[in-house]
């Protein structure tokens, strides 16, 4: 099993800045490194004197330039610097560990890819009118959800011990937060790989005895968690596979309502349904209402990935990737879709982002959502 590293990480959305209009302007690796040193000096002075070494870049093949640079700090941590001065210089950072491009959560890879595409758009004579502005969000609230994963011991009851699937893991994390239901209703069956998979949900879920973190030596304590993830996998017709198990977030919403007593008013929405600005406000409202948000981001080439948003800090959101705490931290999850009077001014590369709103236990009571 991969060694899990806890990251305190903040990834900042690409913010177009300037006056009425802007033009993209590339920055060199040397300039980016100076910005990295400046960042450490302001945010983490204890790391300012350590060397920052470039370890990764994302190249824009159509332009022959780099969309961002990643610098590892010899004292621990790394910072991601934009390769264009039309966006916020610091795209993300962590105070611990090191950047490893070969060992990142798939959802994070998708977000990084979308940022790369957005900077590419800036390089193609892109202009954005930014005369319409709003006050920045401020404040902080964290719900601190369980640091669960998809492999052992969580996959104890899956066919061939295949990984549980990101949808099942994300759903289990949200259910653990609510500690609901005490017992499910009904059962579900489907055919997978020629086998009939079936589960009855009419058994107790012992939430109080489900640990929030796997430490490597408490496998037995996770039996109930493994059963929960198996139940969710069957409830959503999980397509189990050795390389990854897949299902749709929409199917999870249906299952939570049908078998586990969650609100019938819960809704699955795409970011374009609300617009980027309203989207971020709605996410904050969910956290304020004590509702961790099931979230999905997709890549057209490799499919989608589901995870949990469980807090916010100013303009960023706390993301639980469902990787046992690995790479969890603060991210900007909205889109760089500049608008003038409600009209998008450029390509929209984050249209595959989706979330579930108003998801909460019904408890026999239903509160109508305003969505």
Residue positions per predicted region:
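C-terminal, surface-exposed recognition/capping segments
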Residues: 78-82, 230-234, 238, 246-257
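Surface-exposed patches in mature extracellular/periplasmic domains of secreted proteins
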Residues: 48, 180-190, 264-272
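Cys-His-centered catalytic/binding microenvironment captured across papain-like cysteine peptidases
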Residues: 26-64, 73, 79, 85-146, ...
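Active-site-adjacent structural segments surrounding the nucleophilic cysteine of cysteine proteases
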Residues: 87-245
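Active-site-adjacent substructure of cysteine-protease-like catalytic cores
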Residues: 58-75, 254, 258-320
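Bacterial Sec-dependent N-terminal signal peptides
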Residues: 1-27, 234-237, 241, 256
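Extracellular hydrolytic enzyme modules, especially secreted metalloproteases
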Residues: 170, 181, 224, 238-252, ...
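Stable alpha-helical elements in mature extracytoplasmic
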Residues: 32, 162, 167-174, 248, ...
